[in-house]
């Protein structure tokens, strides 16, 4: 199992948001930047405009869990920051929708490991 570390510092987020490539899905947006390490780094940012902390934490848990399940299929050496789209209603946020969105973003960015046939 790969080990992904979480981004913790403000400057780490800023570096990815300014220099990373932008990909968008229906529910989430992603900024992806390659790094020189052999492991992945993950950051999740949910705006305060989502009023209740319970809802923000629920979205973070859904994103983290989906990433954990897709982690084996993702190439290492990348830093990914996921952002929640402000206009999307939280009621539609479920595991399946976010997983589909995340898979689409990883396919667009070509981060999935190619399977040999």
Mark where each language-model region is:
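Positively charged, solvent-exposed patches that mediate nucleic-acid binding
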Residues: 1-117
């Amino acid at each position: 199992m790969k080990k992904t570390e979480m981004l913790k510092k403000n400057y780490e987020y800023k570096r990815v948001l300014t220099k990373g490539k932008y990909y968008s899905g229906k529910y989430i947006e992603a900024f992806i930047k390659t790094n020189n390490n052999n492991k992945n780094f993950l950051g999740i940012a949910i705006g305060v405009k989502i009023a209740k902390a319970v809802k923000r934490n629920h979205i973070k848990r859904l994103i983290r869990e989906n990433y954990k399940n897709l982690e084996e299929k993702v190439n290492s050496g990348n830093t990914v920051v996921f952002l929640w789209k402000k206009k999307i209603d939280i009621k539609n946020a479920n595991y399946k929708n976010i997983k589909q969105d995340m898979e689409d973003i990883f396919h667009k960015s070509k981060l999935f490991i190619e399977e040999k046939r």
